[in-house]
C-alpha cells in the first residue's frame, strides 16, 4: 500500500511539474474568446507551406497530438487559402478530401505534388492527385461543387477569419488557446514533438 501511495504521489508530482512548465505567452497564447462547449483541437495548414510540410510529414506533430488527446476529443484540420496561386483551389480540394474521408491518403501525395515534384500547376492537376489516391475523376468532380463541399469551404474560411489567422502551421485548442511554436523546446525533434503534444493535452483540460 505504501509503495502504491508513493507511486501515485510520483504521478501527481510529475504531472504538476510538467503543467507548471507551460504558461500563457510562452508555450501558448490565451485568446480573448469564449471556449468551445466541447473539447476540440483545430489545426490550420497549407500544402504550399514548407513549415507545414515539416510539421506534418517529417515531425508528424498532428499524429503525436492525436495520440495524446483524451478519448472523444475532436481534432480537425483546415486548409488556408491565402498562400500560393492555387490556394483557394486546394482549400476546396481539402474540403473534398474531408467529405470523402480520404484526408490521410491525400495529405502526403498532395504535399509531394505541390512542393517536391511541383506537378500541381493548375486545377486539373489537383484532380490527378486524387485519382492517384484512389478517388475516381468522376467522384472528385461530383463532390467538387456539392453542397457539402461548399459548406466545408465556408467553414474553413470562417474559422480562419474568426481566429484572425496570420500564418501556418497553427493549432488552436478549445477555440481559446493558440500554441506558440517559438516557445517550445526545439533542441531535439523528439523533444519538440512530445512537448507540443503535452501542451495541447494540458490545454484541453484547462479551465
Curated annotation (Swiss-Prot):
It is found in: Periplasm. InterPro entries: DSBA-like_thioredoxin_dom (IPR001853), DsbA/DsbL (IPR023205), Thiol_disulfide_DsbA (IPR050824), Thioredoxin-like_sf (IPR036249), Thioredoxin_CS (IPR017937), Thioredoxin_domain (IPR013766). It comes from the Bacteria. Residues 1-19 form the signal peptide. Keywords: Disulfide bond, Periplasm, Redox-active center, Signal. Disulfide bonds join 49-52. It holds the Pfam family DSBA. The keyword Disulfide bond applies. GO terms for molecular function: disulfide oxidoreductase activity. Required for disulfide bond formation in some periplasmic proteins such as PhoA or OmpA. Acts by transferring its disulfide bond to other proteins and is reduced in the process. DsbA is reoxidized by DsbB. It is required for pilus biogenesis. Belongs to the thioredoxin family. DsbA subfamily. This is Thiol:disulfide interchange protein DsbA.
Amino acid at each position: 500500500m505504501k509503495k502504491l501511495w508513493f507511486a501515485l504521489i510520483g504521478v501527481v508530482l510529475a504531472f504538476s511539474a510538467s503543467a507548471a512548465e507551460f504558461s500563457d505567452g510562452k508555450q501558448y497564447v490565451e485568446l480573448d474568446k469564449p471556449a468551445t462547449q466541447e473539447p476540440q483541437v483545430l489545426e490550420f495548414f497549407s500544402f504550399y507551406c514548407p513549415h507545414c510540410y515539416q510539421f506534418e510529414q517529417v515531425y508528424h506533430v498532428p499524429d503525436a497530438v492525436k495520440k495524446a488527446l483524451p478519448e472523444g476529443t475532436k481534432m480537425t484540420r483546415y486548409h488556408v487559402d491565402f498562400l500560393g496561386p492555387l490556394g483557394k483551389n486546394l482549400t476546396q480540394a481539402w474540403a473534398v478530401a474531408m467529405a470523402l474521408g480520404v484526408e490521410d491518403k491525400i495529405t502526403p501525395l498532395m504535399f509531394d505534388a505541390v512542393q517536391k515534384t511541383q506537378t500541381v500547376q493548375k486545377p486539373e492537376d489537383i484532380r490527378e492527385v486524387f485519382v492517384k489516391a484512389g478517388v475516381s475523376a468522376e467522384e472528385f468532380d461530383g463532390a467538387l461543387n456539392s453542397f457539402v463541399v461548399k459548406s466545408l469551404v465556408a467553414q474553413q474560411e470562417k474559422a480562419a477569419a474568426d481566429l484572425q489567422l496570420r500564418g501556418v502551421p497553427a493549432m488552436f485548442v478549445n477555440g481559446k488557446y493558440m500554441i506558440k511554436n517559438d516557445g517550445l523546446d526545439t533542441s531535439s525533434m523528439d523533444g519538440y514533438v512530445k512537448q507540443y503534444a503535452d501542451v495541447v493535452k494540458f490545454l484541453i483540460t484547462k479551465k
